Amino acid sequence: MTDFGGAVKQSEEYNIAIIGIPFDEKSCYLRGTSKGPQAIRAASTGKAINPWTEFGANLEEEVTLRDLGDVDVSGDFLDVFSRVEETILKILEKKAVPVVMGGDHSISLSLIHI
C-alpha cells in the first residue's frame, strides 16, 4: 500500500476510504483497467502530492484517509459485484466517503445500486 504522499493513515477510524477494484472482465473493447489501482498507488508514493483540496481541507490534518486495499475480483462477475457492494456499504456504515480506483464501466452498476 502507498501512503499517498503521507495522507493515508492506517487507522481503524477514518472518514475517507480508498478501495481498488482491479476488474476488467466485462470490458467490451480493450483490457487494462484492472491495472489501474496498482498504477495509481505506484504513482502516489512521493511527497510531491498537494494535501490541500479544492474545498480548503488539508488531507494530512483534517481528514483520516485509509487505503483498504483491493476488492477480491476472483470468481463470477456477479460475486465480484456483490463484494464491491458489501465493501461500499461497510464504508458508508462508518459514515466515510468511498474513493474507488479502477474497474471497467460495469463496476459502476455496483456503486450506484446501493
Regions found by a protein language model. Give the residues of each.
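N-terminal glycine-rich anion-binding loop in soluble enzyme alpha/beta folds
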Residues: M1-L78
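Residue-level preference for the first positions of well-ordered beta-strands
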Residues: I16, V97-P98
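Helix-loop module immediately N-terminal to the HCX5R catalytic loop
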Residues: L78-L89
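Glycine-rich phosphate-binding loop signature in dinucleotide/nucleotide-binding domains
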Residues: I91-A96
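Glycine-rich beta-strand-to-loop/alpha-helix junction loops that act as flexible
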Residues: G102-D104
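Short, well-ordered alpha-helical microsegments
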Residues: S108-L109
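Conserved small/polar residues in nucleotide/adenosyl-binding loops
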Residues: I112-I114
